[in-house]
């Protein structure tokens, strides 16, 4: 069992929910990322998604697109993200999920990525644009090296896709709260409740909801329905706005703590 599996087992026993934090690795520079992860963990983040910057990020909204551009400009590659993970592992046991697109993974090589990611301390991988209908070789390569494979289900997902997502996912299933790209929203889509129900019927895995979550109120609303809530653009925006500030890590920790309070006293 990976750190991801152990995390959710522990949280289930303690009747608590997970706050999953996304950040773009290498933004504003690769050297910044380990310290930013430490700040997120101090603030209460239970699992970290390390986003791999990519030149054609079709699922990303403008905030994360800009973060990817900054990270690429700073020389961040898939290989350097794995090096960042190694540095994080020197001081932390927080579960790490590699969040990337299919193209960089195919260029790197499936088996090579599985081996190198496992050696770097990565616990799982999520390919945002992977076709679950054609995922067998990818899943086999990741599982061969002990990595979880997390897949996305959206309000528009067919029953067949949900069935395959349930079959190939390990660790947890990532539910997209709405269609479209990532980004903060004032309100959450009403379509997420039927999606939760549909995926619950297909798997016993923990469910995490992401896309558009940026406030403690969002965390509170969804935390009563699923095992985990994912926050991404709100963290990335804070990093963007305070990249030159000596207090960036303190601000990130404080905001994480504020979001975590959305789960209530048992978070």
From Swiss-Prot:
One Gene Ontology molecular-function label: tryptophan synthase activity
Pathway: Amino-acid biosynthesis; L-tryptophan biosynthesis; L-tryptophan from chorismate: step 5/5
SUPFAM superfamilies cross-referenced by the UniProt entry: Ribulose-phoshate binding barrel (SSF51366)
InterPro entries, A to Z: Aldolase_TIM, RibuloseP-bd_barrel, Trp_synthase_alpha_AS, Trp_synthase_suA
Assembly and interaction partners: Tetramer of two alpha and two beta chains.
EC annotation from Swiss-Prot or TrEMBL: 4.2.1.20
Listed name of the protein: Tryptophan synthase alpha chain
Function: The alpha subunit is responsible for the aldol cleavage of indoleglycerol phosphate to indole and glyceraldehyde 3-phosphate.
Cysteine pairings via disulfide bonds: none
Swiss-Prot/TrEMBL keywords: Amino-acid biosynthesis, Aromatic amino acid biosynthesis, Lyase, Tryptophan biosynthesis
Family of the protein in this entry: Belongs to the TrpA family.
UniProt organism field: Solibacter usitatus (strain Ellin6076)
GO cellular-component term (any): cytosol
Keyword field contains Lyase: yes
Catalysed reaction equations from the record: (1S,2R)-1-C-(indol-3-yl)glycerol 3-phosphate + L-serine = D-glyceraldehyde 3-phosphate + L-tryptophan + H2O
Pfam families per record: Trp_syntA
Active site: 49, 60
Gene3D superfamilies linked: Aldolase class I
């Amino acid at each position: 069992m990976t750190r991801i599996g152990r995390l959710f087992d522990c949280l289930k026993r303690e009747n608590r929910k997970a706050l999953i934090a996304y950040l773009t690795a290498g933004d504003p520079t690769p050297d910044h990322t380990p310290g930013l992860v430490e700040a997120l963990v101090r603030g209460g983040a239970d699992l970290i998604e390390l986003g791999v910057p990519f030149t054609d990020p079709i699922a990303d909204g403008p905030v994360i697109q800009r973060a990817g551009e900054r990270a690429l400009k700073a020389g961040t590659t898939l290989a350097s993200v794995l090096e960042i993970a190694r540095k994080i592992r020197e001081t932390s046991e927080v579960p790490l999920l590699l969040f990337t697109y299919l193209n960089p993974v195919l260029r790197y090589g499936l088996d090579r990525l599985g081996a190198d990611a496992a050696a770097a301390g990565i616990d799982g991988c999520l390919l945002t644009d992977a076709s679950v209908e054609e995922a067998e070789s990818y899943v086999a390569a990741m599982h061969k090296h002990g990595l979880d494979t997390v897949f996305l289900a959206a309000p528009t997902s067919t029953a067949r896709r949900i069935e395959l997502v349930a079959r190939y996912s390990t660790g947890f299933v990532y539910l997209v709260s709405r269609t479209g790209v990532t980004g903060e929203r004032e309100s959450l889509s009403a379509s997420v409740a039927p999606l939760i129900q549909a995926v619950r019927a297909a798997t016993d895995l923990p469910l995490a909801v992401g896309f558009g979550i940026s406030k403690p109120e969002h965390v509170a609303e969804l935390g009563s329905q699923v095992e985990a809530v994912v926050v991404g653009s709100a963290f990335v925006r804070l990093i963007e706005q305070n990249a030159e500030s000596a207090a960036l890590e303190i601000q990130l920790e404080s905001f994480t703590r504020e979001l975590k309070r959305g789960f209530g006293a048992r978070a």
